[in-house]
Amino acid sequence: MTDTAASTSQPALVRNELNLVWLDMEMTGLDPDNDRIIEIAVVVTNSTLDIAVEGPVFAIHQSDETLAKMDDWNKSTHGRSGLIDRVRASTVTEAEAAEQLQAFLAQYVSPGKSPMCGNSICQDRRFMARWMPEFERFFHYRNLDVSTLKELCRRWQPAIYKGFQKRAMHTALADIHESIDELKYYREHFLIPAASASAGESAPAA
């Protein structure tokens, strides 16, 4: 049922309540009441982003009527990437994808512990609350949104901001890895270095 199975060739990631769950979706548009999810992927990292484990990647089946409502940008982008063809061929529903993804994530972190991590992640969360509400509740209510650092860096350190070039693949898994790389970039060039490596293992605030 998955387009891409969970990776088994990466270093082992130990289950830890400080692990971070990264997520990205592709949608038919920007309005969760009228548009639908067409792809979803997850990646779990440790708290310092040194180890990453890829989860399954799902193209979510949607009707031709739903796909026909996409604007020109979405039709062009998702047609060029092959996603529209994958969506048409898929038999996976939002509910089935959510169930399998939650089972995968539970191997690495308990419900309610990880913030939802990604770029402009509030938009993904809006769609998840609409179409995958039980899965949305798996996450902590906080978000780890890399776009916050992006906007601050653009205003406070524009030269550093220009140093990270996005590839804009617009596929869920590629976008997740790009978000992780972007956060690593800001950590190295924009944020004050941590006093010690052990700082990342401190207990999170309530």
Curated annotation (Swiss-Prot):
Question: Active-site positions, per UniProt?
Answer: Y141
Give the keywords, sorted. Cytoplasm, Exonuclease, Hydrolase, Nuclease
User: Exonuclease domain: from which residue to which, for each copy?
Assistant: 20-183
Q: Which GO terms describe its molecular function?
A: 3'-5'-RNA exonuclease activity; nucleic acid binding
Q: Name one GO biological process term.
A: DNA metabolic process
Q: Where in the cell is it found?
A: Cytoplasm
Q: Which InterPro entries match?
A: Exonuclease_RNaseT/DNA_pol3, Oligoribonuclease, RNaseH-like_sf, RNaseH_sf
Quote the Pfam families the UniProt record gives: RNase_T (PF00929)
Tell me which EC number(s) this protein carries: 3.1.15.-
Which is a Gene Ontology cellular component entry for this protein? cytoplasm
Keyword Hydrolase: yes or no? yes
Q: Which PANTHER family match?
A: OLIGORIBONUCLEASE, MITOCHONDRIAL
What biological function has been recorded for the protein in this entry?
3'-to-5' exoribonuclease specific for small oligoribonucleotides.
UniProt lists the family membership as follows:
Belongs to the oligoribonuclease family.
Recorded protein name is Oligoribonuclease
